[in-house]
Amino acid sequence: MRVAGGRALSRGAELRVPGGAKHGMCLLLGATGVGKTLLVKRLQEVSSRDGKGDLGEPPPTRPTVGTNLTDIVAQRKITIRELGGCMGPIWSSYYGNCRSLLFVMDASDPTQLSASCVQLLGLLSAEQLAEASVLILFNKIDLPCYMSTEEMKSLIRLPDIIACAKQNITTAEISAREGTGLAGVLAWLQATHRAND
């Protein structure tokens, strides 16, 4: 799978990011109900198991109505700040010290694409995020959908967005519920937050 001007990953592919970004936090953003909380919980599980073993049933979640800080520890500790989708109007208050951004979209719900695209464009145009590495995650690939992920990317003109953005952007298809692609997300986070000693 290829994306003009950016990087794309097939399911389970390895994510690579060049170093050089400033130290800081990872922001986890996306509309309400896209699976951000489950993603963070699953990333914790994957990092604690070193990517081995079955993840089992997904843990219970509820919509985030504020902010959650979660530490992911593998080769080094990475703090992920998850902001609830309902907090979209004030996300910009949390952009400072952001080294990386995980933006989650629901691949099973094409009707939500336009709203997610508007949010993404707002993030990419923010000066405070100009140097942040961005990973756009198409979550819920385990659920049936009448559009393929490639059709969704084309519909929101993602290749054009990536070509015009200041940020280094990578895309991936994942299933937080099943664990598909999460080892790659963890590897991307580790590479992005590599210490500059």
UniProtKB/Swiss-Prot annotation:
Binding site for GTP: 30-37, 82-86, 139-142
Compartments, record wording: Cytoplasm
Keyword flag Lipid biosynthesis: no
Classification via CDD domains: Arf_Arl
Primary location recorded for the protein, binned into one broad class: cytoplasm
Domain of life from the UniProt record: Eukaryota
Keywords, comma-separated and alphabetical: Cytoplasm, GTP-binding, Nucleotide-binding
GO molecular function: GTP binding; GTPase activity
GO cellular component labels: cytoplasm
Pfam families membership: Arf
Keyword Cell membrane: no
Subunit structure: Interacts with RIGI; this interaction is GTP-dependent and induced upon viral infection; this interaction suppresses the RNA sensing activity of RIGI.
Family: Belongs to the small GTPase superfamily. Arf family.
Role played: May suppress the RNA sensing activity of RIGI in a GTP-dependent.
Protein name in the entry: ADP-ribosylation factor-like protein 16
